[in-house]
Each structure stands twice: as structure tokens, then as C-alpha cells.
From Swiss-Prot:
InterPro entries: Ribosomal_uS8, Ribosomal_uS8_CS, Ribosomal_uS8_sf. Keywords: Ribonucleoprotein, Ribosomal protein, RNA-binding, rRNA-binding. This is Small ribosomal subunit protein uS8. The keyword Flavoprotein does not apply. The keyword Protein transport does not apply. One of its GO terms (cellular component) is ribonucleoprotein complex. Coiled coil: none annotated. One of the primary rRNA binding proteins, it binds directly to 16S rRNA central domain where it helps coordinate assembly of the platform of the 30S subunit. Belongs to the universal ribosomal protein uS8 family. GO terms for molecular function: rRNA binding; structural constituent of ribosome. SUPFAM superfamilies: Ribosomal protein S8 (SSF56047). Part of the 30S ribosomal subunit. Contacts proteins S5 and S12. It comes from the Bacteria.
Length: 132
């Protein structure tokens, strides 16, 4: 079976593991998944991320984060730009997620960054996902 949207699969695996309160999950590695995982870690949505090399493409191990009373830190993840319908924004159209409570992950000419960083650098790009 050929996977048509590995980013959507990655986000769905995080969402599903988060819903059943798993501590970790593993996904096949790629550069964009690594970048997304690093953003989620930097923004405080996940506890940690590890890269495990193997003979093939490698594995990304994501350590999920929960609050004091086991409440989920990630409420939801939503894929925006899809293979069948890409979503691009100009620098002045970069979206705010829940009035700044969430983040938009954007692929730009300067790499994968958050909506706040895109606004600060005044660049647009492809909106990959919303996380809140």
C-alpha cells in the first residue's frame, strides 16, 4: 500500500496516541516530520523527540506531554494543505490559530516554521497544519 499523505498520517498517529494517553509513539522518519516534531517540542506541545537510525529511513520517537491531572496538552491537530488541495498564504495572510493560543505550521523558503516566526520574518508559504 502506498501512503499518499505521510504528514497527515503523522498527525493522525499523534492525535490517536494522545487520545488514548500513550507516553510515546514511533513513526517512519522524514525531514519534514522531523521539522514538525521539533516545532511541537519547541512550542511545548510534546515532551521530547528522538531520531533512531536503522538500515532503512529511520524512526522518529515522539514523547507525548500531559498536564498534572493527565489532561492532554494537544487538544487537536488539523491538516490544512493536502496533496489534492494545497493551501498557500502570502506574508500578510499568515493565519492565527485560536487568536494565538494555537500554532500554524508553515513550510517556507526558509524551512518549516510557526506562524509567529513567519509573521516576524514577513514571509508566506504552505500552511501544513494547525495545532491547538
Amino acid at each position: 500500500m502506498v501512503m499518499t499523505d505521510p504528514i497527515a498520517d503523522f498527525l493522525t498517529r499523534i492525535r490517536n496516541a494522545n487520545m488514548v494517553k500513550h507516553e510515546t509513539l514511533e513513526v517512519p522518519a522524514s525531514k519534514i516530520k522531523r521539522d514538525i516534531a521539533e516545532i511541537l517540542k519547541r512550542e511545548g506541545f510534546i515532551r521530547d523527540v528522538e531520531y533512531i537510525e536503522d538500515d532503512k529511513q529511520g524512526v522518529i520517537r515522539v514523547f507525548l506531554k500531559y498536564g498534572k491531572n493527565e489532561e492532554r496538552v494537544i487538544t487537536n491537530l488539523k491538516r490544512i494543505s493536502k496533496p489534492g488541495l494545497r493551501a498557500y498564504v502570502k506574508a500578510d495572510e499568515v493565519p492565527k490559530v485560536l487568536n494565538g493560543l494555537g500554532i500554524a505550521i508553515i513550510s517556507t523558503s526558509e524551512g518549516v516554521i510557526t506562524d509567529k516566526e513567519a509573521r516576524a520574518k514577513n514571509i508566506g508559504g504552505e500552511v501544513i497544519a494547525y495545532v491547538w
